[in-house]
Amino acid sequence: MLKRKVRYLLLIVVVFTGIILSVEAIMRFQLNKNVDYYLKFFDKHKDNIENMYDPLNIKQIPYSTIDQLYTKRQSEAEPIDWDKFAYVNYITDFEYLCNTLIQFRKLNDSGSKAKLLALVTDTLVNKSKENKEVEALLNKIKSVSDRVAVTEVGSVIQPNDHTPWSKSLTKLAIFNLTDYERIIYMDNDAIIHDKMDELFFLPSYVKFAAPISYWFVTADDLRTVSTDTKKLFKTNKLDPIEKKLASRVKNSLEIYNHLPNLPQHFYSKSMNFIIDIDGFQKSDNKVNFATHLMVIKPDVTMANDIRDNILPRYLKAKEEYDTDLINEELYNFKELIYYQFKIFRKIQYLFKPSVLILPYTKYGLLTKSIDDKRQKDLLKNAILGYERKEKDDLIQDAKFIHFSDYPLSKPWFYSNADDIQCSKKYSISDENCQLWKSLYKEYLESRAICQVN
């Protein structure tokens, strides 16, 4: 009798398990069909779709489109309230005060009308009361323009961390700057060649935009995504896409669905993560968002979540910094697409995308790329998977160039550009070498404004 009951219970368990697995299989099949349908739908019907956005891709926006959106906004009758927009630096150490002064002076001289906000840690502010040099540099920053504001913030320091990035989580204070409609955050170990006011006028639904970490892309990756793009869309030419986007901007039509996709190759081999996001690692993307320049719509809810939930976890973690937090917790490509599609399936016409990828040659160029033959092809175009007839002119076209030449030190540790030598192993040419060195020379010459008596 007992054996019969056991067999009966086992049979029930087997049948129940079979039903669950069958239901899951049907749901997976149906979800895969939905994914395939909408991938084709948005590609085929994008010219006729209004107020519905592709949830299955992360979009790249060309510089020409960014500039046209800004020109369009300037032509409108309603005046721009520049008090709602700010360029932002954060400063944790004395060595970085001069960099902020240089950047703010350049933005002011190039005609930017936005606010210039320096977030200075409380420890550095307190030091200014004793150190006349710190006080003098803070005063110089304030004197750049009446649009400059210096705000004190609390230091966020990784315990038992002695790396140069131990204070990098202080950067997360930028997400709480809710007095502003949109901010452009900039690491200040970078050189600015022109104002970037156009970035304030990305589509209103975009909460976060940044270049990507293009330096992880290999020559093989470039060939693969170029081929994949041709297969999917019959062409990988960017020029007709830019022309189409220009027409839509001019006619006040939605542009999102016409923007180039970030090739799927960079974040997943398949779209299966849409079915089960927990079964996929967040950190196995080939590229992520770079965080040395970010365009952000500050948000109270996100700021509170960072402060109350995310930051406490990261302060306990070892060697986890601002870039990790932003790409793993806030704007992970797989999770973005997973939740975008989840929302879209429930409320199609209410879904709006929240991120864009900025062209890295314009807003995210690293100095080391300028004279590194391994990255030469990467700098021909800033939209991955696509090609343009006219190539970007490296330094002349770049607005923001980040000093990153490990194992070389940051430029303020040198007194003369002649002390810095190009790589013998990876240098592209003498011309590129001189271009690269010219940035160090430009920076070192600009430090003259930081001298205090």
Curated annotation (Swiss-Prot):
Subcellular location: Golgi apparatus membrane; Vacuole membrane
Side Lumenal, residues: 30-453
Top-level EC class: transferase
EC number annotated for this UniProt entry: 2.4.1.-
Annotated Gene Ontology cellular component terms: Golgi membrane; vacuolar membrane
Segments on the Cytoplasmic side according to the record's topology features: 1-8
TM annotation in the entry: 9-29
GO molecular function, one term: transferase activity
Membrane topology listed for this record: Single-pass type II membrane protein
Span of the annotated motif DXD: 187-189
Glycan-modified residues: 108, 126, 176
Alphabetical keyword list: Glycoprotein, Golgi apparatus, Membrane, Signal-anchor, Transferase, Transmembrane, Transmembrane helix, Vacuole
Described function: N-acetylglucosaminyltransferase involved in the Golgi-specific modification of N-linked glycans.
UniProt similarity note: Belongs to the GNT1 family.
Protein name: Glucose N-acetyltransferase 1-B
Upper taxonomic lineage: Eukaryota, Fungi, Dikarya, Ascomycota, Saccharomycotina
